[in-house]
């Protein structure tokens, strides 16, 4: 499981010119699911995401977490995070999980992070062409792979 985390002042998802969801200050998470991902990958990432100290304290140091600031979260599925560009110029997505497995894991991830935050999170729609608007804060962008826990 792989995430791209972006600290935002606000973000939104639009589908077919209709606003689907939006958040204020918090995190926009792009979530990629791999074929062999499990609950332990979800648990690792959720704990890491909600506790990452990437928000500024009153001295301007990144010392506060999403939980500390009571921020919001928007989670968008992103199978292209597992793109392979090893051969040729057309990316291969063979490592990305098939929908039948990915959708339940995406829903579990969203439910688990919502529970960890004690609030409802916002989401995109799986397997749908979405327009994402965001205002980066910083910018701060962090990539985490549950299989590479550096």
Swiss-Prot record:
Enzyme class: hydrolase
Coiled-coil regions, chain positions: none
Keyword Cytoplasm: yes
Keyword terms of this UniProt record: Cytoplasm, Hydrolase, RNA-binding, tRNA-binding
EC code: 3.1.1.96
tRNA-binding keyword on record: yes
Major location category of this protein: cytoplasm
Matching InterPro entries: Daa-tRNA_deacyls_DTD, DTD-like_sf
Location of the motif Gly-cisPro motif, important for rejection of L-amino acids: 138-139
Superkingdom, taxonomy of origin: Bacteria
Location(s), subcellular: Cytoplasm
CC annotations in GO: cytoplasm
Listed GO MF terms: D-tyrosyl-tRNA(Tyr) deacylase activity; Gly-tRNA(Ala) deacylase activity; Ser(Gly)-tRNA(Ala) hydrolase activity; tRNA binding
One of the protein's GO biological processes: D-amino acid catabolic process
Catalytic reactions on record: glycyl-tRNA(Ala) + H2O = tRNA(Ala) + glycine + H(+); a D-aminoacyl-tRNA + H2O = a tRNA + a D-alpha-amino acid + H(+)
Domains as described in the record: A Gly-cisPro motif from one monomer fits into the active site of the other monomer to allow specific chiral rejection of L-amino acids.
Functional note: An aminoacyl-tRNA editing enzyme that deacylates mischarged D-aminoacyl-tRNAs. Also deacylates mischarged glycyl-tRNA(Ala), protecting cells against glycine mischarging by AlaRS. Acts via tRNA-based rather than protein-based catalysis; rejects L-amino acids rather than detecting D-amino acids in the active site. By recycling D-aminoacyl-tRNA to D-amino acids and free tRNA molecules, this enzyme counteracts the toxicity associated with the formation of D-aminoacyl-tRNA entities in vivo and helps enforce protein L-homochirality.
Subunit structure: Homodimer.
Protein family (similarity comment): Belongs to the DTD family.
PANTHER family per record: D-AMINOACYL-TRNA DEACYLASE 1, D-TYROSYL-TRNA TYR DEACYLASE
Protein name: D-aminoacyl-tRNA deacylase
Phylogenetic classification of the source organism: Bacteria, Pseudomonadati, Bacteroidota, Bacteroidia, Bacteroidales
């Amino acid at each position: 499981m792989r995430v791209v985390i972006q600290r935002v002042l606000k973000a939104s998802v639009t589908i077919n010119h209709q606003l689907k969801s939006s958040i204020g200050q918090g995190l926009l998470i792009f979530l990629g699911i791999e074929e062999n991902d499990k609950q332990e990958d979800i648990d690792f990432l959720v704990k890491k995401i909600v506790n990452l100290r990437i928000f500024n304290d009153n001295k301007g140091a990144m010392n506060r977490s999403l939980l500390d600031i009571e921020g919001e979260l928007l989670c968008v599925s992103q199978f292209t995070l597992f793109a392979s560009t090893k051969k040729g110029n057309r990316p291969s997505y063979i490592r990305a999980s098939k929908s039948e497995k990915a959708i339940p894991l995406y829903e579990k991830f969203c439910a688990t992070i919502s529970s960890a935050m004690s609030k409802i999170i916002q989401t995109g729609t799986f397997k749908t062409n979405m327009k994402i608007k965001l205002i980066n804060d910083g910018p701060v962008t962090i990539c985490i792979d549950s299989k590479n826990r550096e």
